[in-house]
């Protein structure tokens, strides 16, 4: 909106620069989240929209009165900042906002069900995955119709591994959406544990998106160019800004939880960025914490069903370390460090090709 008004009509050149608009979006989203979150917390407490705490984690029972669904606020702030600072005529921008709002809506439905039932079950698995599947499929098909190429790239290699047939690419993208959104959802179990790794991953992906959308940088770095995708940089920075605003209230001890309203939206948007910037494989490294958390659940369930034995004291793995006696803050900060290092290694792939 501001972009169209100030650059399109008044020809204010500052607004033609992607980096300026992304920076402006960051601060708008940050301060808007900072302003709205206390009001949301008061409203949520009045409505008793508290996070149900699992009886299997007795050390977390002191969190039972903490309101949830804070993700609604940072998603809203991101959308407002994006509408103001991004070009709304760009399909990548529109699809990015659809992903954020759509995945957040599914998360909201799940959160609402948990609050009403006062347990952690939420929606049925069939309903939840069905909604996520349809949303992922629609966005993937639209990306295909947009003309996003279907080459599969591996990190540190300048040439693609191979070109996927369209139907295979769409199926693969749907898998990336579903796996990433649920991986972030599983990670969101301690104060700030999902927020900071999401920030690191989004910052890394935003750099890749910026390079992919810039003809000079993509040519110099031998990176696959994706026409018009650079505008997504604005939304990514806005989401990072809103996450910093959310973290202000979510750091230990948390005043609010993001809930599925936030974690599914984050995972969906991270997946979207990875797909449009051809980083589906590299996402495993950038989102290493999310991958490890998910694998710990898969291995735990698989081991128990096949051998009647548990590999971990509790899954996801952050609870395993809590059960071993690690303080919550120690688990959180160490996971942050791992996430930061994995993203720094991922960024090296930009130059090493």
Swiss-Prot record:
Its main location: membrane. It comes from the Bacteria. One of its GO terms (biological process) is peptidoglycan biosynthetic process. It holds the Pfam family Glycos_transf_4. The keyword Zinc does not apply. Catalyzes the initial step of the lipid cycle reactions in the biosynthesis of the cell wall peptidoglycan: transfers peptidoglycan precursor phospho-MurNAc-pentapeptide from UDP-MurNAc-pentapeptide onto the lipid carrier undecaprenyl phosphate, yielding undecaprenyl-pyrophosphoryl-MurNAc-pentapeptide, known as lipid I. This is Phospho-N-acetylmuramoyl-pentapeptide-transferase. It comes from Helicobacter pylori (strain Shi470).
């Amino acid at each position: 909106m501001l972009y169209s008004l100030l650059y399109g009509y008044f020809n204010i050149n500052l607004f033609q620069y992607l980096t300026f608009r992304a920076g402006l979006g960051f601060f708008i989203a940050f301060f808007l989240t900072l302003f709205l979150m206390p009001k949301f917390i008061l409203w949520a407490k009045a409505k008793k929209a508290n996070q149900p705490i699992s009886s299997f984690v007795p050390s977390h029972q002191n969190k039972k009165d903490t309101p949830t669904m804070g993700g609604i606020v940072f998603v809203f702030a991101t959308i407002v900042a994006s509408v103001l600072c991004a070009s709304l005529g760009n399909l990548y921008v529109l699809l990015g906002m659809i992903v954020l709002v759509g995945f957040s809506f599914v998360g909201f439905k799940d959160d609402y069900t948990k609050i009403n039932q006062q347990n952690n079950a939420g929606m049925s698995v069939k309903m939840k995955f069905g909604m996520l599947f349809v949303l992922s499929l629609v966005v993937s098909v639209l990306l295909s119709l947009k003309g996003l190429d279907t080459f599969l790239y591996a990190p540190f290699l300048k040439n693609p591994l191979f070109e996927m047939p369209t139907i295979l690419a769409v199926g693969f993208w749907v898998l990336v959406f579903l796996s990433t959104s649920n991986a972030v959802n599983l990670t969101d179990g301690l104060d700030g544990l999902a927020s900071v790794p999401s920030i690191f991953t989004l910052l890394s992906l935003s750099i890749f998106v910026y390079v992919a959308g810039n003809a000079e940088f993509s040519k110099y770095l031998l990176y696959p160019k994706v026409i018009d995708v650079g505008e997504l940089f604005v939304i990514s920075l806005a989401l990072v800004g809103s996450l910093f605003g959310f973290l202000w209230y979510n750091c230990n001890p948390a005043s609010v939880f993001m809930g599925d309203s936030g974690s599914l939206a984050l995972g969906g948007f991270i997946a979207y960025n990875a797909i449009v910037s051809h980083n589906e494989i590299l996402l495993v490294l950038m989102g290493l914490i999310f991958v490890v958390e998910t694998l710990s659940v898969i291995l735990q369930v698989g081991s128990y069903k096949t051998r009647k034995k548990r590999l971990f004291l509790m899954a996801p793995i952050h609870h395993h370390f809590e059960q071993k006696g690690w303080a919550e803050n120690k688990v959180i900060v160490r996971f942050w460090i791992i996430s930061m290092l994995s993203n720094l290694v991922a960024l090296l792939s930009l130059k090493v090709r």
